[in-house]
Amino acid sequence: MKTTSEIRQSFLDFFHSKGHTVVPSSSLVPENDPTLLFTNAGMNQFKDVFLGLEKRPYTRATTAQRCVRAGGKHNDLENVGYTARHHTFFEMMGNFSFGDYFKHDAIQFGWEYLTSPQWLGLPKEKLYVTVYETDDEAYDIWNKIVGVPTDHIIRIGDNKGAPYASDNFWAMGDTGPCGPCTEIFYDHGETFWGGLPGSPEEDGDRYIEVWNIVFMQFNRLADGTMEKLPKPSVDTGMGLERMTAVMQHVNSNYETDIFQTLIKEVAGLLNVSDLDNKSLRVVADHIRACSYLIADGVVPSNEGRGYVLRRIIRRAVRHGNLLGAKEAFFYKLVPTLATVMGHAGEVLTQKQAHIQKTLKAEEEQFARTLERGLALLEDALTKVENNTLSGEVAFKLYDTYGFPLDLTADVCRERELTIDEAGFEAEMTAQRERAKASSNFGTDYNNVIKVEGQTDFIGYDNLEAQATIVGLFSNGKAVDTIQSGESAVIILDQTSFYAEMGGQVGDSGLISTEICNFAVNDTQKYGQVFGHIGQLTSGSLSIGDKVTATVHATRRIAITANHSATHLLHSALREVLGDHVAQKGSLVSENILRFDFSQPEAISKSQLEEIERIVNRKIRENIQVTIETMDIESAKKKGAMALFGEKYGDVVRVVGMTEFSIELCGGTHVQRTGDIGLFKLVSEGAVAAGIRRVEAVTAETAIEWLHNQQKVLQQSAEFLKADSNSLVEKIQQLQDKAKRTEKELQQLKDKLAAQAGSELVKQANKINGVNVVVQKLENVEVKSLRTMVDDLKNQLESAIVVFGTVADEKVNLIVGVTKDLSSKVNAGELVGAMAQQVGGKGGGRADMAMAGGSEPQNLDNALKFAEEWIQAKL
């Protein structure tokens, strides 16, 4: 039985053998295509090539493209887990011709890959094809050249109410490239309900589309006229999950190897015995979408792609809750996913820590409100009228508890209820209008904080302020007093604490009186007021109390150094890489600075070194940092750069470090660049298509980082008994030695396997005159089994060979049959029957097949069964 990874690789290998360039999957975040929320088809990355706007160094390409359909026009989210084939994430295998081959080769390639025993080997009688009603050329190729009988070819006309509106006619839009398509369907058999394509029962599970070839041969003009393209092209798609289900002889994608592995992992984590539970399917599907989206740079948020990701995570968490999850579990699935995805999981392995950290934080954040939200929903469901949940309740769940509408719809669906979506939209519109009409005073900040007036910030020049408490909030409510031990948000009339803005984190410190201490952990801005977030450690505080607000000085100084260094870094990046560099996001904390920016390609080591040299040179120059306030037009004339995502008023603050760096900025900065001390880049990489990220440390943190690096270098040199200057050379020598040893070990294993094979020839039994070898082998690697079987078949010339081994508590079975006997004894049938004896599944070709199982204690019985089975066949 072929695994998903093997099928993926075989597709790429086949088309590579046909002269196609293997192109890596593009990001799930489409590059330079604002019309798409996510990559949802293999052709997305080639859109400009098909339109003639871009040229590639090849005219034939093949890909294994990761895709997401959740949100926007292509939204499968609500069906995921409840059907056999809906997914949020899927892989689309594709082969493409850009003005190279056309219908004849495209059809022949597809048929060869699907039916040739060398590749997938599907039975031809199980396949049906559809063509566009007037595409006689495609029909004739299928019938006269490929040899598909006429009763297996179906013409599909305009079945969507307009000319050229058909399941078998594709168009990029109302105008532009378009053309007919031909599809291949697999017949799962009479045991499944459903009719042929084009019939009233076509949506059943019997006939499943597994291959689609689009022939881009026309350009549709605005008046509907079709003109032939000078260089027609081909776009082919094969859904990997669907094809895997076919190859593994199951009807549901969730029964295939990848999903079964994930489902069992979820069940094990949550102690679930019913593996058919639909919530297991939901979680198994959603971990794929979430992990790959995060790997491609999407982060959970309340808008755009980030909100779709958040919706998927929260749906998974809610289904985990249904399965009995009591703590964060979703993030624990990432390592298993990375492993089971094979080569396609390498990107997950590289970013595993980031993916798990993001998922865990989001899961824990939602868990805090999930229980309360579900309680509210359960109460509301007992009061529904006309089987419809009110839009008002659905909106409250969304607004207060973070329940996406489709999550609430999920719960209602389980009760056979619907949601008043129009009422939900009306509530959403009303909230937008309220926000738009409100003033800066008395505004509902984050649905909780309502304070008249504003907080005056005096912290640029003062780390301590005398202030009056004008607002107190605890447990999500406005209060008059807080007591020792309570967590709260304190609003002051003025403060020296900087609130998180422009990438700079909020200050921490102490708010105190003679008898009270409130430890501030963070500072956030709510409209025009600053919220000091923390815990009262002694005494009590009330609105109107006079307090002293003292910023944690050491932390502020470290943050300030990192912020000024970020400005120098931005200018250095533009100097080395070019003016295309634009800030796309940043983080300025006390420990590290992070800077995201537009950059289409990786940065070389020499470029990174030059960037670092420039920043440190500017630090050594000890430049005076100037702060000016001016109108926005004057700032623009001065050449000031604006921060990504920030909004500016008519009057702005301009931070300058001579002409080298001039930016609009409201953050805190050093007085002279020399105060930064030292700058050290510590990482660089991609976070999304066309977006790079660098991280750096400064001052004491940079010195500590260098000390740690030096310590690692010294320890490594001592461990390898080498001088630190020759450490690289020593490592290279060890690597070369390891490769030689590995090669010698493999040669020894092959030699031992050959010797074992020679011994087994002597032990061959005769059953009705046929050489039969049935053996349980010890200490033989799985990859050596096939070699041993082939060697025995060659030595015996006419034979049936059956081996069984146990490794890591798993059974491995292999059956080999020489071609003269394969008509009597089918290796695929035999290994499949044996696999059932050891709790597994398997199959393969008539002459060679492998299987696995999970019950090693039954291997001896399986081998005895094989002997009896062979004897019966012979």
UniProtKB/Swiss-Prot annotation:
Chief location of this protein within or outside the cell: cytoplasm
Protein name: Alanine--tRNA ligase
Entry EC number(s): 6.1.1.7
Binding site for Zn(2+): 563, 567, 665, 669
Keyword line: Aminoacyl-tRNA synthetase, ATP-binding, Cytoplasm, Ligase, Metal-binding, Nucleotide-binding, Protein biosynthesis, RNA-binding, tRNA-binding, Zinc
Broad enzyme group: ligase
Reactions that this protein is recorded to catalyse: tRNA(Ala) + L-alanine + ATP = L-alanyl-tRNA(Ala) + AMP + diphosphate
Cited SUPFAM superfamilies: Class II aaRS and biotin synthetases, Putative anticodon-binding domain of alanyl-tRNA synthetase (AlaRS), ThrRS/AlaRS common domain, Translation proteins
Top-level taxon of the source organism: Bacteria
Listed GO MF terms: alanine-tRNA ligase activity; aminoacyl-tRNA deacylase activity; ATP binding; tRNA binding; zinc ion binding
The record's note on its domains: Consists of three domains; the N-terminal catalytic domain, the editing domain and the C-terminal C-Ala domain. The editing domain removes incorrectly charged amino acids, while the C-Ala domain, along with tRNA(Ala), serves as a bridge to cooperatively bring together the editing and aminoacylation centers thus stimulating deacylation of misacylated tRNAs.
Gene Ontology biological-process entries: alanyl-tRNA aminoacylation; negative regulation of DNA-templated transcription
UniProt keyword annotation of Coiled coil present: no
Pfam annotation, one family: DHHA1
CC cofactor: Zn(2+)
Organism of origin: Actinobacillus pleuropneumoniae serotype 5b (strain L20)
InterPro entries cross-referenced by the UniProt entry: aa-tRNA-synth_II/BPL/LPL, Ala-tRNA-lgiase_IIc, Ala-tRNA-ligase_IIc_anticod-bd, Ala-tRNA-synth_IIc_core, Ala-tRNA-synth_IIc_N, Ala-tRNA_ligase, Ala_tRNA_ligase_euk/bac, DHHA1_dom
Function in brief: Catalyzes the attachment of alanine to tRNA(Ala) in a two-step reaction: alanine is first activated by ATP to form Ala-AMP and then transferred to the acceptor end of tRNA(Ala). Also edits incorrectly charged Ser-tRNA(Ala) and Gly-tRNA(Ala) via its editing domain.
Cofactor note: Binds 1 zinc ion per subunit.
Family under the similarity heading: Belongs to the class-II aminoacyl-tRNA synthetase family.
